[in-house]
Amino acid sequence: HNAVADARPADHRPDGGCAEKKKKKWGVTMSEEKTIYTITSDRNERVFIHAMPGHFVSSSSHLNFYIGTSDIKHNHDISVDAAMMLASYYHERGIEIDTVLCLYETQALGAYLAHELQRANMLNPNPDSTVYVLGPEYDAQGNIIFRDNLRKLITGKRVLLLISCITSGKTIERAMESVSYYGGETVGISAVFSAINEVDGVEVNKIFSADDVPGYQAYPPHDCPLCKGSQKVDAITNG
């Protein structure tokens, strides 16, 4: 997600009165311009996202929160911690990964994730495989394509899709279609934040969910209460 939002009332409470229950996970930064909530992970307090209330538009949904994941994507220390959290999911389940396909500026996080996936663990004490990291290229229609020299990293490979945020899953579905088209198999989906639990039968391995952002809602574009209430759009976001 990349967005800039206008001001929201400083006393806006996105949790509908549930702030006390979530107190240990919420931090609040308020200024004249905006209110930003910092949400930390239960598993590692150094890993966090930001949530900003408002009216935001993605490619498939209207949202009442903007989820900021920049620190996890671009801060080295936080990225490493987040990668360890995401990798543990695959270690615990014995899921082997050949290629990490990074969507929406997650290449740095993807590199750390690949490093963690290659490390020895209890289920695989002597790993001998290489995990590749790949960023997508798009054609004029927005489909993911792979040049001849990179197709070998997808064809016949077990692919992990990495993305910052998932709202409806449409972006991941398109990526899965591209992986399948080039002869690969999507065996894992990892996200910093996801509002859904699975896409086309593949469970989403996520650090944060919609439950971590009390009051979070994603609406169909044709049935958005924010639009019906004439609330202006603050920004357009990815995902």
Language-model features: locations:
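Active-site-facing substrate-recognition patch
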Residues: W26-E96, G239
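Intrinsic-disorder-associated, low-complexity terminal segments enriched in Asp/Asn/His/Tyr and depleted
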Residues: H1, D11-H12
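Hydrophobic Val/Ile/Leu positions in short beta-strands of Rossmann-like dinucleotide-binding domains
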Residues: C102, L161-L162
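Polybasic, lysine-rich low-complexity intrinsically disordered segments
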Residues: K21-K25
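Short glycine-rich phosphate-binding loop at a beta-alpha junction
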Residues: I95-T106
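PRPP-dependent phosphoribosyltransferase catalytic core
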Residues: W26, S31-T40, R174-G239
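Short, glycine/charge-rich flexible loops or terminal/linker lids adjacent to PRPP-binding catalytic cores
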Residues: Q107-L160, T167-K170, P221
